């Protein structure tokens, strides 16, 4: 029974469209096992990772959903491109320095990290091995703080 449930759950997750709230989660989740990052002792880091995995965050892609803003118009106020998880973790100008530090650390644990495509980089960030949870949690927390303090990021 549990094997059938797992199979059906994974099929449903993999079929979620790009407009679905759980689209990213469906791409990240490839089994029904508990994720290793959930064993992290730091509640804040666990919570931040969970929120980004489940698209329960303050990025434009999510805030715009609740305000019925068309997806293509849910832009980062600083960079004027789609404000989604890819942009936040991999490209946003507001956290370049933080990202550089995180990526330097990641390449010590993930061979050839810098050569991965965007999805696989994001997958390693949002499906971290236990040694990386703290560093990724700090990156998320500090990046969100930078966004909140930046006048360009003021939300309507």
Task: Describe the role of every protein-language-model region.
Residues 1:
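Negatively charged
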Residues 6-156:
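Family-specific functional microsites
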